[in-house]
């Protein structure tokens, strides 16, 4: 036994302990103590003397974790409501599941005799008998590995108890460890930040947090970000370089191989041949011949015994019954399934077998019935719902096999989902099937002399076994009659099966070893098989051992998970005896981690008759069937061996023997010898099938009669797998016969024993190293196997992000796990995997118990889990992303090169034949001298003139939500109302000319009258948006700030708003005592002013325009009378506005072009403006479009928020609007007033949607203005349509414009921002050198125009930065012209189109605001580009905003869905930003819809959002800090 690696050495017990034990036995026998009390006391007595058995790998994990001290790492914040996840099922005894489809083979026993945890409250009663698995504490017992497999000396009971209490303390109170640093010791720890909870004071009872530099931080969020930054600053292990190449086209670097990586050095391996297959002369010649022989000569011999969930035998099928029932079924299939007098089935047709795991008898009848009828059985799993995990792929299998008939039992059919007609439902992706119930009463007895003509030899297909690949596709492996016979003969020879032996089978009898041994080979040898159903194993994991005893079974067929669970349940079972077993076949012996289950099982059961040589691991695959199996010595097997391999070597595909003291080693056992009659070789995993060297890991290939022959109906993939020709290094084929690839990775060891280290399906290639999913699962389970992960259910897979595999680990957490437990466990898993595998985990997700998709026998359906992860339907309850650690192939951060001087740039452009990027609108010179221009120099004069010449001409119509006109103003009415306001200002307000007056009005005619009233008395108006009555707390301070910053001497408003400004509610938000004079203009007396003020010069200030930029800066610009009239003149010319025109305006009238269109243009041009307040659309979305239709407006203006509201709100109502008579064919131009890059997707959606209402396709365009000039571009009624170009987004990040074709990768569409207005000149200047740039070069847009603002009145926030905005000069070229800098990046491009003047048209493309751009990794990003990608990532993302905080990218997404689905978004957001922008997201914040603040123009207020985030005011659903 010593060679098995984990001996249980008996320590001699002192006399007093023996005496106490004897007393205990007596008390128990006399009934003075319960069994439970006895076991507790006995365990306490023996605890010091029983050596701790712990598998090497668990120890390695503990040792690795012991090296990490607890360190601070920000814990994700979660809203309380998002914490509640009810598990589907309460906690039941351990399941047989784990990551792989072979359910749970990876679960390791851990420490088997530690009984200390039995007194722990909270461990379920059924667990009291169970030996607790390894702990994650770094107590003395878990840190040492034991060379040679000998256990360490047992620590004293007091030490062990101290270790336990320390463990409990650490688990419950310590901070989650830092995952990104090396093994640096940090002695202090701090309690992690718990999730933020609504309604509970945050930070209560906490110490004041400090940053790394000791600076106190008063924000919970800031402290977490600081922790994250500190974590990221620390050196990582191994050092992670940023690999790159300079070539712009191929930004991402393939990771360079490590020059010190191990390389294979051995000789080239030779093909290994198994012993010859000896076919006995006296045995049956085929499987059906055997069935007929035993069925007729030994009819009473038992063939198969089925058990129920209580472990009682429900049915024993004899060979006679099997033969007669199979014949009956064959006869029915061939003769009684007729449609239109033709047989429904022909020889060779495929038939699905749908039988539950609890009914082996009917399955066996069906299988042999099909073989007798020359039909091909295709066993599949019973579908539980219409949309089972992988159902579509099973449908693909059935379709590719041409299956039209399914056999099942009565009971099974009753349990299948039904359609409303009562028929069996159609399952997702399945072809139409006929269902045949094969219970006895449904079958027809054949005539006495009837016998099928079945030919069961040769290359014809016998049956098809399904196989699910890594990607989830299900294919059918064809097994021919000759392969089937050879497999039975090889297994008989290798396992030494003899007639009438008993075999206990725990495996699925429908496929794999369970089918080959328990259904096929058993019949060949007239064996008796006891089948243990899965449901019984769940209830009683010891049932198979009990059946081995009661039936004196000679062989048993199990998986390592079965051994593991029976170990946990074996206490108190005294009468178990396994001496009858000569072979215990471990079907998943190829799983590298099965060795620990085998060793632990032997340790416990050797004293109960189990001989070490009985344990026989084997290796198999669906394609090659059985590849190798260990034989007992009496069958000629060599002694078993194990190999301790360096994990690092394995990751490079190289075998390096190591010692067990090392942490990162993999101990594997042999899976025995090659099968009789087979040849085996190992070939390279990638590329051509070259033979491996003797110290190299490769894919095992088999040549044998006994393998599968093809993937049914799939010739393409068949050739690669079943017809491989291995070649030597010189390219010479090693054999004239093809080999079959097994999908197993391994090597041939000493004594020609086969060793398997993993499966190709579980291989993840990260960088240049390979990692096995099973290995990662095993490490994660060893962290705290029994404590945290629900039933050991862990899935590991890789996803491709940024051209490399990234490891994702998903685990089901116990229903009672707390947030802190979860985070603690995740942190430790990351450390353990980093230590042992030297690889980072990209994403670690925890889901509630019982929510991962299940494979047929309770394991996890990996491909379905991966699919859900990528689709965002996994619904985790905790997520930890570590992109900073894992993503090492980002492009090199941009190094700014010394800039070329402005003069050289001009010369360069001249040499290249490029013109300087300069453009202008129509000339205004010839208009300057005209009477009208002089007459219309002051708007107050224009209004008086109109009131005198056309007094009754209507200028304004205001609509309410119902579409009715609530107020109008003719020229004379507006003039008179303005006079009244002027009189009130002079008499009541006692204001002088030049005083500033704040106008706080809702959108309407009152605001316009107040504006002209101010002009009439020489005051300077400042329009201010009124506070929102329901949201005074945030809106009133802005009003107050503008009033104060603009130095307003008086506030004009309506009665209602005046009351609001002085109310108690207002007093809570601002100091109401410091308001200047507030005048209410609702009931002012009808008075005239003695004389209307006339400004002494056109350059005198006319009004102030205040606006808050998207970066949160409040800026007021000064508009002179000259600039005001120039603006109106320019718009009049561009839009061809005359008194006979009507235009519709749906804009906020408080600043920029919106204010000019609402208040100024109608008075100047005389056209009628239909005013639609945007707020009214909240109660009637169709108001604006109905107004446009009703008044037949040729020109209309709106904001993006209005357009979005119409697109979202009226999407399904276009038909209804058409019925109401809404017709938009009158519209020539519909302009979106904006200060940003045109939102093409929104304008296109709007155009497409309302095309049905007659909206011309060319009508929609955008305007462009900014603080220095509110109207630079505006499409107007003439000139070419706006053009769209496509630019390379990657070049844009480098401040370059690279034009590409539509649809090319990384292309970004940019639409021209309307036409440059008359009198406006635009040039593109370099942002730093201020030199002029060439055509199609990206730079800052500079503007010169008579309607430029004359300067900032004040900039609240960043005064110093803006001094030169209005008086910039070029550093080279035309250095005389005074320009205003817009602060926007863009470029000019001369198009092939012609203007009205006949000149070629210059298009201006706005890329984005310079203030908003994010400088990350030396590149310039525009937030909108990242946000567009994020919104596309998942249908539940309603809106998104990004900003930076100390070099971390923060992404805020609004969730339009269920709160419990919020965490799905974290990984998708991180993935998409990495893939499309090469950026690592630092923090993902998930919030409710409407949290991202948006201004009246529909622009996101990212800086307000940032302030709210840092002040912890967003009430997020979840905040994920990416490591």
UniProtKB/Swiss-Prot annotation:
Location(s) in or outside the cell: Cell membrane; Mitochondrion; Cell projection, Dendritic spine
Domain of life: Eukaryota
Traits of the deletion mutant: Defects in dendritic spine morphogenesis along with thin postsynaptic density and reduced synaptic transmission of pyramidal neurons. Reduced postsynaptic density protein levels of Grin1/Nmdar1, Grin2a/NR2A, Grin2b/NR2B and Gria1/GluR1. Significantly reduced acetylation of Cttn. Autism-like behaviors including excessive repetitive self-grooming, reduced vocalization time and impaired social interaction.
Subunit structure and binding partners: Interacts with FSTL1; DIP2A may act as a cell surface receptor for FSTL1. Interacts (via N-terminus) with CTTN (via SH3 domain); the interaction promotes acetylation of CTTN and is required for proper synaptic transmission. Interacts with SHANK3.
Residues where Phosphothreonine is found: 92, 115
Pfam family, one: AMP-binding
EC nos: 6.2.1.1
Residue ranges of every copy of the DMAP1-binding domain listed in the record: 9-105
Protein name according to UniProt: Disco-interacting protein 2 homolog A
Source organism: Mus musculus (Mouse)
Family membership noted in the UniProt record: Belongs to the DIP2 family.
Biased composition (Polar residues): 87-99
Cited function: Catalyzes the de novo synthesis of acetyl-CoA in vitro. Promotes acetylation of CTTN, possibly by providing the acetyl donor, ensuring correct dendritic spine morphology and synaptic transmission. Binds to follistatin-related protein FSTL1 and may act as a cell surface receptor for FSTL1, contributing to AKT activation and subsequent FSTL1-induced survival and function of endothelial cells and cardiac myocytes.
């Amino acid at each position: 036994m010593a060679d098995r690696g984990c001996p249980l050495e008996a320590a001699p017990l002192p006399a007093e302990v023996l005496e106490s034990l004897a007393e205990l036995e007596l008390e128990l026998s006399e009934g003075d103590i319960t069994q439970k009390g006895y076991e507790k006391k006995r365990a306490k007595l023996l605890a010091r003397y029983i050596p701790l058995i712990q598998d090497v790998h668990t120890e390695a994990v503990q040792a690795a974790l012991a090296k990490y001290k607890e360190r601070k790492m920000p814990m994700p914040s979660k809203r309380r409501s998002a914490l509640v996840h009810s598990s589907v099922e309460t906690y039941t005894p351990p399941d047989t599941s784990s990551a792989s489809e072979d359910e749970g083979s990876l679960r390791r026993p851990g420490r088997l005799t530690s009984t200390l945890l039995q007194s722990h409250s909270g461990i379920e009663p059924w667990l009291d008998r169970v030996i607790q698995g390894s702990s994650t504490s770094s107590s003395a017992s878990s840190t040492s590995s034991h060379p040679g497999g000998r256990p360490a000396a047992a620590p004293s009971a007091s030490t062990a108890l101290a270790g336990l209490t320390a463990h409990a303390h650490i688990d419950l109170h310590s901070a989650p460890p830092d995952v990104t640093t090396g093994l640096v010791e940090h002695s202090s720890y701090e309690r992690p930040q718990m999730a933020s909870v609504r309604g509970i004071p945050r930070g209560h009872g906490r110490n004041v947090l400090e940053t790394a530099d000791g600076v106190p931080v008063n924000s919970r969020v800031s402290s977490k970000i600081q922790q994250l930054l500190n974590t990221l600053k620390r050196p990582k292990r191994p050092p992670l370089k940023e690999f790159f190449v300079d070539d712009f086209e191929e930004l991402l670097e393939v990771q360079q191989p490590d020059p010190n990586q191990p390389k294979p050095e051995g000789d080239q391996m030779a093909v290994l041949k198994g012993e010859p297959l000896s076919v006995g002369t006296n045995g049956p010649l085929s499987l059906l011949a055997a069935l007929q022989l035993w069925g007729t000569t030994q009819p009473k011999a038992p063939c198969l015994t089925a058990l129920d969930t209580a472990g009682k035998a429900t049915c024993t099928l004899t060979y006679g019954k099997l033969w007669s029932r199979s014949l009956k079924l064959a006869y029915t299939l061939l003769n009684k399934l007729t449609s239109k007098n033709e047989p429904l089935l022909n020889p060779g047709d495929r038939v699905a077998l749908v039988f539950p795991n609890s009914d082996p008898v009917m399955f066996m009848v069906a299988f042999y019935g099909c073989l007798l009828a020359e039909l091909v059985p295709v066993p599949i799993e019973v579908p539980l719902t219409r949309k089972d995990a992988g159902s579509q792929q099973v449908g693909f299998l059935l379709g590719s096999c041409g299956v039209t008939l399914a056999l099942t039992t009565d009971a099974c059919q009753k349990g299948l989902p039904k359609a409303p007609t009562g028929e069996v439902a159609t399952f997702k992706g399945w072809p139409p099937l006929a269902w045949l119930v094969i219970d006895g009463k449904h079958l027809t007895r054949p005539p006495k002399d009837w016998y099928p003509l079945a030919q069961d030899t040769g290359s014809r297909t016998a049956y098809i076994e399904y196989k699910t690949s890594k990607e989830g596709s299900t294919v059918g492996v064809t097994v021919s009659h000759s392969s089937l016979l050879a497999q039975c003969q090889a297994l008989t020879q290798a396992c030494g099966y003899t007639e009438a032996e008993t075999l206990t089978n725990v495996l699925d009898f429908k496929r794999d070893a369970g089918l080959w041994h328990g259904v096929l080979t058993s019949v060949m040898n007239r064996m008796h098989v006891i089948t243990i159903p899965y449901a019984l194993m769940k209830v009683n994991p010891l049932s198979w051992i009990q059946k081995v005893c009661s039936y004196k079974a000679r062989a048993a067929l199990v998986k390592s998970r079965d051994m593991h669970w029976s170990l946990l349940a074996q206490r108190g079972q005294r009468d178990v005896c396994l001496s009858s077993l000569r072979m215990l076949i471990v079907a998943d012996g190829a799983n590298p981690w099965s060795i620990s289950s085998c060793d632990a099982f032997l340790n416990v059961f050797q004293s109960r008759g189990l001989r070490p040589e009985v344990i026989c691991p084997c290796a198999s695959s669906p394609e090659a069937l059985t590849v190798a199996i260990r034989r007992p010595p009496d069958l000629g097997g060599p002694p078993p061996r194990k190999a301790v391999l360096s994990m690092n070597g394995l990751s490079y595909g190289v075998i390096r023997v190591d010692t067990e003291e090392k942490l990162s080693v993999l101990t594997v056992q042999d899976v025995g010898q090659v099968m009789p009659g087979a040849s085996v070789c190992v070939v390279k995993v990638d590329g051509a099938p070259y033979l491996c060297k003797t110290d190299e890991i490769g894919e095992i290939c088999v040549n044998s009669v006994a393998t599968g022959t093809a993937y049914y109906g799939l010739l393409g993939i068949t050739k690669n797998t079943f017809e491989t020709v291995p070649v030597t290094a010189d390219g010479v084929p090693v054999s004239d016969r093809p080999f079959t690839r097994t999908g197993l990775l391994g090597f041939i060891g000493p004594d020609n024993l086969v060793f398997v280290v993993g499966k190709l399906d579980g291989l993840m290639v990260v960088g240049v190293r390979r990692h096995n999913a099973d290995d990662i699962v095993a490490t994660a389970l060893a962290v705290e196997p029994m404590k945290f992960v629900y039933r050991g259910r862990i899935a590991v897979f890789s996803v491709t992000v940024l051209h490399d595999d990234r490891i994702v680990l998903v685990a089901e957490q116990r229903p009672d796990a707390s947030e802190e437990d979860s985070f603690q466990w995740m942190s430790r898993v990351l450390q353990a995997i980093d230590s042992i595998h030297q690889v980072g985990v990209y994403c670690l997700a925890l889901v509630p118990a019982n929510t991962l998709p299940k494979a047929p026998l309770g394991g996890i359906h990996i491909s379905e889990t991966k699919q859900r992860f990528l689709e965002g339907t996994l619904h985790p309850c905790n997520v930890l992303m570590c992109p900073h650690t894992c993503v090492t192939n980002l492009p090199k951060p941009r190094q700014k090169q010394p800039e070329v001087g402005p003069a050289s740039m001009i010369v360069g452009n001249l040499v290249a034949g490029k013109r300087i990027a300069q453009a202008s609108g129509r000339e205004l010179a010839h208009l300057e001298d005209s009477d009208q221009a002089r007459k219309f120099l002051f708007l107050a004069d224009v209004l008086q003139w109109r009131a005198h010449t056309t007094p009754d001409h209507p200028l304004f119509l205001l609509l309410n939500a119902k579409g009715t006109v609530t107020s109008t103003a003719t020229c004379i009415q507006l003039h008179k109302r303005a006079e009244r306001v002027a009189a009130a200002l002079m008499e009541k307000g006692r204001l002088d000319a030049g005083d500033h007056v704040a106008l706080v009005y809702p959108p309407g005619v009152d605001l316009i009258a107040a504006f002209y009233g101010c002009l009439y008395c020489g005051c300077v108006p400042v329009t201010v948006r009124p506070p929102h009555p329901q949201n005074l707390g945030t809106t009133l301070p802005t009003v107050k700030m503008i009033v104060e910053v603009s130095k307003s001497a008086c506030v004009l408003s309506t009665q209602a708003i005046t009351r609001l400004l002085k109310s108690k509610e207002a007093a809570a938000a601002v100091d109401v005592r410091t308001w200047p004079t507030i005048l209410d203009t609702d009931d002012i007396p009808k008075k005239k002013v003695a004389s209307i003020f006339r400004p002494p010069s056109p350059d005198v200030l006319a009004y102030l325009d205040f606006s808050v930029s998207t970066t949160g800066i409040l800026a007021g610009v000064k508009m002179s009378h000259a600039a005001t009239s120039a603006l109106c003149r320019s718009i009049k010319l561009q839009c061809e506005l005359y008194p006979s025109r009507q235009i519709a305006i749906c804009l906020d009238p408080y600043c920029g072009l919106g204010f000019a269109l609402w208040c100024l243009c109608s008075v100047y041009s005389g056209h009628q403006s239909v005013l639609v307040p945007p707020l009214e659309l909240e109660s009637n979305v169709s108001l604006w479009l109905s107004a446009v239709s009703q008044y037949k407006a040729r020109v209309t203006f709106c904001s993006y928020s209005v357009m979005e509201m119409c697109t979202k709100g009226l999407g399904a109502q276009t038909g209804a609007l058409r019925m109401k008579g809404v017709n938009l064919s009158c519209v020539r131009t519909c302009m979106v007033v904006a200060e940003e890059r045109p939102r093409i997707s929104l304008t296109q959606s709007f155009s497409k949607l309302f095309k049905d209402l007659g909206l011309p396709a060319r009508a929609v365009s955008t305007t462009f203005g900014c603080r220095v000039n509110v109207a630079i571009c505006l499409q107007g009624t003439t000139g070419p349509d706006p053009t769209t170009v496509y630019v390379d987004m990657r070049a844009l990040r480098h401040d370059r414009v690279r034009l590409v074709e539509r649809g090319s990768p990384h292309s970004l569409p940019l639409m021209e921002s309307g036409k440059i207005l008359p009198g406006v000149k635009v040039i593109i200047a370099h942002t730093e050198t201020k030199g002029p740039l060439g055509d199609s070069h990206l730079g800052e847009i500079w503007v010169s125009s008579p309607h430029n603002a004359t300067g900032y009145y004040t900039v609240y926030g960043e005064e110093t930065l803006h001094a030169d905005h209005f008086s910039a000069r070029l550093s080279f070229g035309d250095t005389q012209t005074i320009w205003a800098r817009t602060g926007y990046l863009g470029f000019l491009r001369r198009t092939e189109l012609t203007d009205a003047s006949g000149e070629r048209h210059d298009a201006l493309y706005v890329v984005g605001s310079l203030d908003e751009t994010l400088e990350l990794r030396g590149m310039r990003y525009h937030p909108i580009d990242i946000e567009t990608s994020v919104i596309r990532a998942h249908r539940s993302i309603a809106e998104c905003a990004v900003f930076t905080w100390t070099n971390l990218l923060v992404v805020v997404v609004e969730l339009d869905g269920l709160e419990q689905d919020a965490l799905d978004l974290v990984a998708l957001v991180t993935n998409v930003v990495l893939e499309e922008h090469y950026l690592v997201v630092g923090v993902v914040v998930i919030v409710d819809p409407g949290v991202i603040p948006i201004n009246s123009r529909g622009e996101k207020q990212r800086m307000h959002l940032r302030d709210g985030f840092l002040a912890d005011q967003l009430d997020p659903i979840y905040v994920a800090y990416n490591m």
